[in-house]
Amino acid sequence: MTEAMKITLSTQPADARWGEKATYSINNDGITLHLNGADDLGLIQRAARKIDGLGIKHVQLSGEDWDADRCWAFWQGYKAPKGTRKVEWPDLDDAQRQELDNRLMIIDWVRDTINAPAEELGPSQLAQRAVDLISNVAGDRVTYRITKGEDLRDQGYMGLHTVGRGSERSPVLLALDYNPTGDKEAPVYACLVGKGITFDSGGYSIKQTAFMDSMKSDMGGAATVTGALAFAITRGLNKRVKLFLCCADNLISGNAFKLGDIITYRNGKKVEVMNTDAEGRLVLADGLIDASAQKPELIIDAATLTGAAKTALGNDYHALFSFDDALAARLLASASQENEPFWRLPLAEFHRSQLPSNFAELNNTGSAAYPAGASTAAGFLSHFVENYQQGWLHIDCSATYRKAPVEQWSAGATGLGVRTIANLLTA
């Protein structure tokens, strides 16, 4: 077995020979990371990415300066989808080691699930993986129901059925109930709704190759809220929470939905389809209707929903939308506590009316006259939240996945957002 490369931390600057701004240096004992107090976690993560790039696949985090957050920052940068890596962790107290172990188990699950090829991860497989993860941490405190295929149509889940019917792999709705009280009549504190498009070709509004090649990751919202619930449970979540995952492929076939089709939802809303590549909101609508029916204090939906959010924020921040200023502030406070990047974008009442249709109440996409695509998408979703002005958060997951490596991340999924949502649930 290869001897581990020892990684230590220092608050002293590197020797001048390494350069004025050197963040790490190498000596006979191993590698030293030089912290400057400005962005130590970011520095550690970027250094870990460089260490991996050197081909070093076995490391030992050594010394007393490591804590759970610093270990986690290292792992976020060190982990990559190809190859194997081994880390010998430092001695941590029991609470910190448990926190680190839970992050490794759950957030790595999120990253690995998002990175999985669409051939291996269809709608049914995604739903079952979510059940397995939650059951592993919740035991008998969880029950669930899986509805698929024509049963969705028969039960009125017309958005999910319409989008998913073009694939040989049936669309699936997972409804999972985490109820630690044991009381079947206990109120539901929160509902989490996730977009689980396991591959998005764009449908008849087909994507170009450059925009389709990462669309195995279009189920990132579903993976994120699943991970968030699991992580909140490990942190002692003692309130009832329901999870709704809307899982489907968006493909082209003789049975696929078409431009001009009209979908009638269970809440009476009629939606004209004018872009089959704006399918995420169509499946989320069904989940939000179910979530609203639970009368929870809090509804959070998460989706890799729009390119507009990425245009605004890149892949560095998740976009947050809400009519509830106090709730948005709470989530941003949770994000700050967990050192995860969220940024609030505008959502106003007028965005709800910027989806006009000549044949239905709503269009599933905005026109050139209304170019605020991320905000109008959130406005669309609000039509399916019963009390949309209070207790509802929409997360457009622009920081879920990276097509190419950068200085702090490998290519692929990041797992960002899991800890923030879990923090909010357990606050």
UniProtKB/Swiss-Prot annotation:
UniProt keywords, alphabetically: Aminopeptidase, Cytoplasm, Hydrolase, Manganese, Metal-binding, Protease
Keyword Ubl conjugation: no
Family, similarity comment: Belongs to the peptidase M17 family.
InterPro entries: Leucine_aapep/pepB, M17_PepB-like_N, Pept_M17_PepB, Peptidase_M17_C
Quaternary structure annotation from Swiss-Prot or TrEMBL: Homohexamer.
Cofactor field: Mn(2+)
Gene assigned in the entry: pepB
Entry GO MF terms: manganese ion binding; metalloaminopeptidase activity
Superkingdom field: Bacteria
Chain residues that bind Mn(2+) 1: 200, 277, 279
Cofactor remark: Binds 2 manganese ions per subunit.
Subcellular location: Cytoplasm
GO cellular component terms attached to this protein's record: cytoplasm
Chief site of localization: cytoplasm
Active site: 207, 281
Enzyme class: hydrolase
Function in brief: Probably plays an important role in intracellular peptide degradation.
Reactions catalysed: Release of an N-terminal amino acid, Xaa, from a peptide or arylamide. Xaa is preferably Glu or Asp but may be other amino acids, including Leu, Met, His, Cys and Gln
GO BP, one annotated term: proteolysis
Tagged with keyword Nucleotide-binding: no
Protein's name according to its UniProt entry: Peptidase B
Annotated positions binding Mn(2+) 2: 195, 200, 218, 279
